[in-house]
UniProtKB/Swiss-Prot annotation:
Membership in a protein family: Belongs to the bacterial ribosomal protein bL21 family.
Native species: Burkholderia multivorans (strain ATCC 17616 / 249)
Keyword presence, Ribosomal protein: yes
Protein name: Large ribosomal subunit protein bL21
Assigned keywords, A-Z: Ribonucleoprotein, Ribosomal protein, RNA-binding, rRNA-binding
UniProt keyword annotation of Ribosomal protein present: yes
A GO term from the CC aspect: ribosome
Stored Pfam families: Ribosomal_L21p
Length: 103
């Protein structure tokens, strides 16, 4: 069984037992959270799509860890003008383990 969930402005296809990194969620480590924005649920050949959400469906997950992604380097330069600007960004994430899918 799998589900398509929406969190942090992104959509993820998840199954029970998977781990995934999503945008940071303010929750403690080892806390159980419920993701109720389920867009689709499927098992085998049968798929149930929501309009836009599947009513009564939810995904239970456990927070495994919090962290930061690898650094993205930003470099701006104007040719022939001796202008260079360096910058960087590291996005925070929350790692989740999917425990159950309720459809």
């Amino acid at each position: 069984m799998y589900a398509v969930i929406k969190t942090g402005g992104k959509q993820y296809k998840v199954a029970v037992g998977e781990k995934l990194k999503v945008e940071q969620i303010p929750a403690d480590i080892d806390a159980e959270i419920t993701l109720d924005q389920v867009l689709a649920v499927g098992e085998g050949e049968s798929i149930k799509f929501g309009t836009p959400l599947v009513s009564g469906a939810s995904v239970k997950a456990t927070v495994v860890s919090h962290g930061r992604h690898a650094k993205v380097t930003i470099f701006k330069m104007r040719r022939r003008k001796h202008y260079q600007k360096h910058g960087g960004h590291r996005q925070n994430y929350t790692e989740l383990r999917i425990d159950a899918i309720n459809a």
